[in-house]
Amino acid sequence: MLLRTIRKVSSLQSLSELLKDRFLVMPLDQKRQHYKGEHRTLGSILTWHDYFGDDESRLKFQLQENYKELPVQPYPVKSDLNKKVSLFSGDITALEVDAIVNAANNSLLGGGGVDGAIHRAAGPELLEECRLLNGCKTGDAKLTGGYHLPAKYVIHTVGPKGEKPALLESCYKKCLEIALKENIRSIAFPCISTGIYGYPQQAAALIALKTVRSTLENHSDNIERIIFCTFMPADLLIYECLMQLFFPKN
């Protein structure tokens, strides 16, 4: 009985790998026929260098109006890093990048919010691969294929419920470690844990930005772009302000 179960699991894993590899090696024009909606190429998304440059007066005023006291002191100016990050407001499942990050639950079997949206856009093949991963611990991350998504891969991470800085920081670090290990050069993050998990939005953004800045300081040659993807207007406002501190122009 045990041997039969092992063989069945092994067979399912092999089938899942075949399906994943089929999408990973598929020519781009052919893969685009499998997308379930619109897509945004990496080249169509402004770098922070250009985003800020196109709207500098409004963004500076916004920072002054919303932050009478800065939550952190501005980081040193490094123009090359400003071209490695982007701020995008919209649907993360539309991004044609190497990987998008899924704010998943411990089961990795889908849920509400961005988790459900990613599973719907990726198709049932994603769920089948996730079933083989035996879940994921809070603060950890695991990699799957992207299937019908414009993104090649999905990095699933489980954020903490409530304000637990070490665990949230671990989510971002683990995702970036996977990206570096797997030669994933463009990656998009949602706002992890800020929805029903209740992490305060500004506190979560500070951790995300600090972790990304630190990673880029040490690995900028291995990363083409890191995208902060917001959906709620409040998150967009927070990132528009705080990115001026972590990735200042002058």
Where are the language model's segments positioned?
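Macrodomain-like recognition of ADP-ribose-binding/processing modules
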Residues: 1-250
